[in-house]
């Protein structure tokens, strides 16, 4: 048997930064090569890999994780990932994992969008940490960040050793050039970059802003559907993973790492995006939120928001997630004799919300695209006074379509602690609480 025989022909699909090619499915075992025959046949680590490449395994879970949950990829690259000079710490206080600088607050909090950054701010320099819990030590919890950038990364590359990155663009497209291929992502799409995968970010529109959820814990997965059945919510076929693509580029470059809550830099003499072929199930992917199959009530009452769950990071407690990524997409509301917007609520979980476009149906004003809100554990929240009055008198015999909107939520089991930047930000709306002060007393014991 010739162990270096070419791989199956369907593994070779040419791709380029200008024309990314994708593979469909969530968590699949993919096999892809940018040069024909670059994937070894019948084994992972041959004595001599095709084209003089190096074989390297990238492990996203423990070797002994159950097969259904085991995540790893074999990469065939021009140089191993170990080839760079030593890392040195970067002195900065914007992108980090310190969630204990200021006390967590039981108040309802809301922020306006970040201001435009200074000229020449790339994706990494444009990230600012807003809140989080847990940390990379315990491998649980999340960091919540906002980004605003106006320059592409050219001589810089980045990877995150602390967690996987869920990227939610709000304005401007992103071109994510990764070790395992290229993703073009626009607002109303999301992307997930696995822990450890190196990448750089180009800005096709010249500027971009959005949100990041840094998942320190179990890898994001699709939720079980239970009695919904075998289809619904985010369908696996709509998740797209890139085909192999590489660049063979030498120069004086910088590799930035987020490790143990801090940023580090190392000089590197070549582009680390030099993976010519790969196979496995640990890879970046994107998803179009507009394809979400929304489930709702067609009789009465607004169901729990768990019906809007896109991705989850499970915890060690069955039925309790460490992180939920939830969206509130365009949808028809048909519930009769019911209050149709999301109801008033106090939650054991903590909720960080963002708005990609439009108006959130529980807030008539003040919550704008690019902004954010935080309602922590057992903090009362819900529709503002204007929304309540309008929805309380709406004609519920007729269906109504919520259109041109997309809000989302990072919901966590742990208290979400704002950073000093967020707590002292000029974007913090000091009078957010006033949106509920107009809720009138309607109680009349003589009138049922």
Curated annotation (Swiss-Prot):
Residues involved in Fe cation binding: 345, 351, 381
EC number: 1.13.11.5
Catalytic activity line of the entry: homogentisate + O2 = 4-maleylacetoacetate + H(+)
Residues that bind homogentisate: 360, 381
EC primary class: oxidoreductase
Disordered: region residues: 1-26
Signal peptide: none
Statement: the UniProt record of this protein carries the keyword Lipid biosynthesis: no
Keyword annotations of the record: Dioxygenase, Iron, Metal-binding, Oxidoreductase, Phenylalanine catabolism, Plasmid, Tyrosine catabolism
Cofactor: Fe cation
Function: Involved in the catabolism of homogentisate (2,5-dihydroxyphenylacetate or 2,5-OH-PhAc), a central intermediate in the degradation of phenylalanine and tyrosine. Catalyzes the oxidative ring cleavage of the aromatic ring of homogentisate to yield maleylacetoacetate.
Family indicated by similarity: Belongs to the homogentisate dioxygenase family.
Subunit field text: Hexamer; dimer of trimers.
HAMAP family on file: Homogentis_dioxygen
Record-given protein name: Homogentisate 1,2-dioxygenase
Organism: Ralstonia nicotianae (strain ATCC BAA-1114 / GMI1000)
Taxonomy of the source species: Bacteria, Pseudomonadati, Pseudomonadota, Betaproteobacteria, Burkholderiales
């Amino acid at each position: 048997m010739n162990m270096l025989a070419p791989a199956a022909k369907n593994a070779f699909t040419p791709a380029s930064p200008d024309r990314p090619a994708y593979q469909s499915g969530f968590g699949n075992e993919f096999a892809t090569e940018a040069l024909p025959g670059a994937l070894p046949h019948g084994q992972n680590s041959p004595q001599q890999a095709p084209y003089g490449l190096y074989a390297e395994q990238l492990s996203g879970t423990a070797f002994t994780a159950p097969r259904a949950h085991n995540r790893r990829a074999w990469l065939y690259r021009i140089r191993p990932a170990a080839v760079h000079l030593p890392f040195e710490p970067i002195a900065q206080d914007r992108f980090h994992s310190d969630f204990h600088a200021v006390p967590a607050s039981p108040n309802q909090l809301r922020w306006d969008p970040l201001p435009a950054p200074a000229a020449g701010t790339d994706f990494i320099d444009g990230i600012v940490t807003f809140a989080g819990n847990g940390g990379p030590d315990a491998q649980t919890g999340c960091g919540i960040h906002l980004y605003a950038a106006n320059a592409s990364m050219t001589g810089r590359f980045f990877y995150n050793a602390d967690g996987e990155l869920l990227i939610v663009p709000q304005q401007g497209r992103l071109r994510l050039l990764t070790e395992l291929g290229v993703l073009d992502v626009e607002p109303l799409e999301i992307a997930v970059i696995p822990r450890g995968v190196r990448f750089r970010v180009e800005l096709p529109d010249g500027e971009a802003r959005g949100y990041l959820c840094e998942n320190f814990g179990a890898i994001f997965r699709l939720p079980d559907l239970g009695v919904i059945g075998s289809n619904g919510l985010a369908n696996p076929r709509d998740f797209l993973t890139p085909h192999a693509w590489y660049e063979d580029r030498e120069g004086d470059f910088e590799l930035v790492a987020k490790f143990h809550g801090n940023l580090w830099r190392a000089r590197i003499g070549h582009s680390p995006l030099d993976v010519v072929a790969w196979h496995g199930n640990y890879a970046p992917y994107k998803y179009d939120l507009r394809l979400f199959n929304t489930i709702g009530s067609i009789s009465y009452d607004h169901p729990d928001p768990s019906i809007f769950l896109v991705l989850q990071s499970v915890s060690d407690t069955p039925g309790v997630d460490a992180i939920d990524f939830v969206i509130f997409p365009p949808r028809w509301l048909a519930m009769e004799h019911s209050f149709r917007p999301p109801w008033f609520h106090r939650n054991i979980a903590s909720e960080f919300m963002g708005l990609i476009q439009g108006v959130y149906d529980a807030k008539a004003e003040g919550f704008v695209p690019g902004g954010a809100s935080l309602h922590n554990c057992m903090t009362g929240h819900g529709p503002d006074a204007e929304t309540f009055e309008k929805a309380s008198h709406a004609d519920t015999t007729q269906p109504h379509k919520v259109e041109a909107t997309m809000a989302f939520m990072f919901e966590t089991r742990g208290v979400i602690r704002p950073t000093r930047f967020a707590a002292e930000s000029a974007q913090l709306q000091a009078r957010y609480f006033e949106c509920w002060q107009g809720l009138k007393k309607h109680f009349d014991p003589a009138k049922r």
